[in-house]
Swiss-Prot record:
Species name: Mycobacterium tuberculosis (strain ATCC 25618 / H37Rv)
Pfam family, one: PGI
Signal peptide: none
EC number: 5.3.1.9
Similarity field: Belongs to the GPI family.
CDD domains, per database record: SIS_PGI_1, SIS_PGI_2
Keywords: Acetylation, Cytoplasm, Gluconeogenesis, Glycolysis, Isomerase
Protein name, entry field: Glucose-6-phosphate isomerase
Main localisation: cytoplasm
Keyword Endoplasmic reticulum: no
Cellular-component GO terms for this entry: cytosol; plasma membrane
Highest taxon of source: Bacteria
Length: 553
């Protein structure tokens, strides 16, 4: 499959048309948009799978959307999308296919990439995971002393940690086998020590998640965890209390893990896209293979929508392009994600890696410098906590911060309110709807004065509005719905990356710091005075640290 040249999107007529359009409507208030088009609240919506998405409170018109779609076609979005699904090596800097979508293909699908039957390979690993977790959950698999495993500890970092942590918390209601999970990622020993403090080695299983089985933080923590285990149960216990998610059989075997209990994945799966691969083993132990299959099916619903829906009604495309509209034409630096669900409290952190590691690039895929800002900064907290922390800036600050609100109609937890007029979940969601409304429409000085506010206070209470947001609603938080939400953002990232002309699937920016850390470790720990560093700041910091540690400075 041949590829069209990657255009410098800012040098195209489509970009110029959007720039002129922004000059025309950029200062128009959402109050005016709704007055001019009263039906937009019903019509600027899209339903896909179990998600209802309202994008009417964005500073766009139907003309804006048409121009953004034209921009996407100018960037060959449909062609690039089809190449990704077909297994073309669109990760050009590493010469790799990008096939996280293959992880959720049904068993009867067909996809051969580089001569390999990808679907067969994926389901072989899923079957192995299912067989193992069935044994663990039933009690057939026991620890070295014969006791059942009650806690799994996932040791990983980056995509091997952020995804499992987020999903475990989000799907806690679906844990059904008496097994809990904990997660260790930070090389700071406080992380591991706190995690193990109240655990029984005899009932603890460790999952070491590292593709190469050489990731510094992961192997450092895994080695310390093995020492904790063997101090209590002896060296022979390792094979009953450790399994691996890796592709390096030799190093896994050297560690003491039976390679029959090693679950693999592929170089066409990036870490931040891997929670639905064997990296999700800890999740399957907790929720079981059937719920995990529902999770994968949710991803696939959005995959098919993204692959087949016209761009004009394609949810990830529309949301990705709207994000780009704010980044490149309004100068917005960030997007906040506000789940009105405490179980999704780690979802913004998960999206930080997904979006910022993917699109935080200053070089286009062809090696030339980018000509526009790339990479939205994602952040957020669950509602209503955020309302009492940073919503002040959203409402009355000088920075434009588009917001994504996520909520559910049917709670998995609920309690009545003291007034008896509804439930706590109703109270939560009334805040959801109120915040999107106030962000959009605000309250004018005249309205505030009419309330009897003293004249000298009126200006301080003005709510300017015109703050854009997306509202995403689903019936309830299920494994499938969570998969749909994740895939919705995955494909937004792809959409933006294609338009910007960057490679969204490499992450060279994280490598140099790791290399430098390895070089500095002997400098800060070695005997004798350390060699001078190449800059006076690092040199001074190293010497200060060594002095505080009682080493020669």
């Amino acid at each position: 499959m041949t590829s069209a040249p990657i255009p410098d999107i800012t040098a195209t007529p489509a970009w110029d048309a959007l720039r002129r359009h922004h000059d025309q409507i950029g200062n128009t208030h959402l109050r005016q948009f709704f007055a001019d088009d009263p039906g937009r609240g019903r019509e600027l919506t899209v339903s896909v799978g179990d998600l209802y998405i309202d994008y009417s409170k964005h500073r766009v018109t139907r003309e804006t959307l048409a121009l953004l779609i034209d921009l996407a076609r100018t960037a060959h979005l449909e062609e690039r999308r089809d190449q990704m699904f077909a297994g073309v090596h669109i990760n050009t800097s590493e010469d790799r296919a990008v096939l996280h979508t293959a992880l959720r293909l049904p068993r009867d699908a067909e996809l051969v990439v580089d001569g390999q039957d990808v679907v067969t390979d994926v389901h072989a690993v899923l079957d192995a995971m299912g067989a193992f977790t069935d044994r663990l959950r039933s009690g057939e698999w026991t620890g070295a002393t014969g006791k059942r495993i009650s806690t799994v500890v996932n040791i990983g970092i980056g995509g091997s940690d952020l995804g499992p942590v987020m999903v475990y918390q989000a799907l806690r209601h679906y844990a059904d086998a008496g097994i809990s999970a904990r997660f260790v990622s930070n090389v700071d020993p406080a992380d591991l020590i706190a995690t193990l403090a109240d655990l029984d080695p005899a009932t603890t299983l460790f999952i070491v998640a590292s593709k190469t089985f050489s990731t510094l933080e992961t192997l450092t923590n895994a080695t310390a965890a093995r020492r904790w285990l063997t101090d209590a149960l002896g060296d022979a216990a390792v094979s009953r209390h450790f399994v691996a998610v890796s592709t390096n059989k030799r190093l896994v075997d050297d560690f003491g893990i039976n390679t029959d209990n090693m679950f693999g994945f592929w170089d066409w799966v990036g870490g931040r896209y891997s929670v639905d691969s064997a990296i999700g083993l800890s999740l399957m132990t907790v929720i079981g293979r059937d719920a995990f299959a529902d999770f994968l099916a949710g991803f696939h619903i959005i995959d098919r929508h993204f692959a087949t829906a016209p761009l004009e009604s394609n949810a990830p495309v529309l949301l990705g392009l709207i994000g780009l509209w704010y980044s490149n034409f309004f100068g917005a630096q960030s997007r906040t994600v506000l789940p009105y669900s405490n179980d999704l409290s780690r979802f913004p952190a998960y999206l930080q890696q997904l979006t910022m590691e993917s699109n935080g690039k200053s070089t286009r895929a062809d090696g030339s410098p980018v000509s526009a800002d790339t990479g939205e900064i994602f952040w957020g907290e669950p509602g209503t906590n955020g309302q009492h922390a940073f919503y002040q800036l959203l409402h009355q600050g000088t920075r434009l911060v588009p917001a994504d609100f996520i909520g559910f109609a049917q709670p998995l937890d609920d309690l009545p309110t003291a007034e008896g007029t509804g439930s706590m979940h109703d109270l939560l969601m009334s805040n959801f709807f109120a915040q999107t409304q106030v962000l959009a429409f605000g309250k004018t000085a005249e309205e505030i004065a009419a309330d009897g506010t003293p004249a000298h206070v009126v200006a301080h209470k003005v709510m300017p509005g015109n703050r854009p947001s997306t509202s995403i609603l689903a019936s309830r938080l299920t494994p499938s719905v969570l998969g749909q939400l994740i895939a919705l953002y995955e494909h937004q990232v792809f959409t933006e990356g294609v338009v910007w002309g960057i490679d969204s699937f490499d992450q060279w920016g994280v490598e140099l710091g790791k290399t430098q850390a390895k070089a500095l470790l002997p400098v800060i720990t070695g005997a004798g005075s350390p060699p001078p560093q190449s800059d006076s700041s690092t040199d001074g910091l190293v010497r200060r640290y060594r002095t505080e540690r009682g080493r020669a400075g």
